[in-house]
Amino acid sequence: MRLKYLRKKKKISQLKLALDLNMNQNSISRYETGTREADYATLIKFADYFNVSIDYLLERTDNPTFNK
């Protein structure tokens, strides 16, 4: 998942991301390291937050925009 890449590109901390999304910082860390998998609702939160498609977030495409 490109979560860490997107977070660093936006220059925000795990804590800021967690607070913005009403999540736990430990969960963000686990998603970034791959020790925890995000459910669909969480993937939507991340994709909406970073304004990318879920496919881009999950590295299924290199196109960050939504298919229209």
State the predicted function of each range.
Residues 9, 58-68:
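Short, charged recognition helix plus adjacent turn
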Residues 9, 35-38, 49:
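Helix-turn-helix/winged-helix DNA-binding modules
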Residues 41-56:
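DNA major-groove recognition helix of helix-turn-helix/homeodomain DNA-binding modules
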